């Protein structure tokens, strides 16, 4: 979380907003139903309030289309910095481009948005994938495995899967396990 705030500060600094007070930061959540985002939101709000800045947000509720409208709404409410947890890395691009034209810094939070000038902050997804694979292998070291990767529109699914594969390959070479399925989950939702 601290890194997110450091990147937000860097974005503000690079746009000349560093000395401004009462900067409005808009946060676009892809799916606020996950408990993690509520924890992160509390930390972001607290830091912004401490700095004398304003927090506004919108929840896309799992809809890439709604997220585009949400970002328009955040911009119309005066957001001078955007933090975006993208529902779909490609569908979000029109909103990111609109913000860029308005010289609004965009921070891709947790999910990569491949667009010029977008800051990206996340944890080490590959290492998390390795950790997941180690835990699964410890619990069930032999047998048939099905790999469920998450949404194909979330780049983290591939990063996690890459880390898992590094660990699983070694066990597979010993003949202890076999991958019998490897699928994305379209529209992956927390419920």
Regions found by a protein language model. Name each.
Residues 18-191:
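A residue-level marker of the well-folded mature domains of exported/periplasmic proteins
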Residues 1-19:
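Gram-negative bacterial Sec-dependent N-terminal signal peptides
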């Amino acid at each position: 979380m601290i890194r997110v705030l450091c990147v937000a500060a860097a974005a503000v600094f690079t746009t000349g907003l560093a000395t401004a007070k009462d900067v409005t930061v808009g946060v676009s959540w892809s799916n606020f139903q996950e408990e993690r985002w509520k924890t992160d939101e509390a930390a972001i709000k607290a830091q912004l309030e401490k700095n004398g800045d304003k927090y506004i947000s919108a929840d896309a509720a799992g809809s890439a289309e709604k997220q585009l409208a949400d970002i328009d709404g955040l911009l119309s409410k005066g957001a001078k910095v955007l933090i975006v947890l993208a529902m779909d890395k490609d569908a979000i691009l029109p909103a990111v481009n609109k913000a860029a034209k308005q010289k609004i810094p965009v921070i891709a939070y947790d999910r990569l948005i491949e667009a010029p000038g977008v800051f990206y902050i996340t944890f080490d997804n590959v290492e998390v994938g390795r950790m997941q694979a180690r835990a699964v292998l410890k619990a069930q070291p032999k047998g048939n495995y099905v790999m469920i990767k998450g949404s194909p529109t979330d780049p983290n699914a591939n990063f996690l899967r890459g880390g898992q594969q590094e660990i699983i390959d070694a066990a597979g070479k010993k003949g202890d396990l076999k991958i019998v399925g490897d699928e994305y989950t379209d529209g992956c939702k927390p419920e």
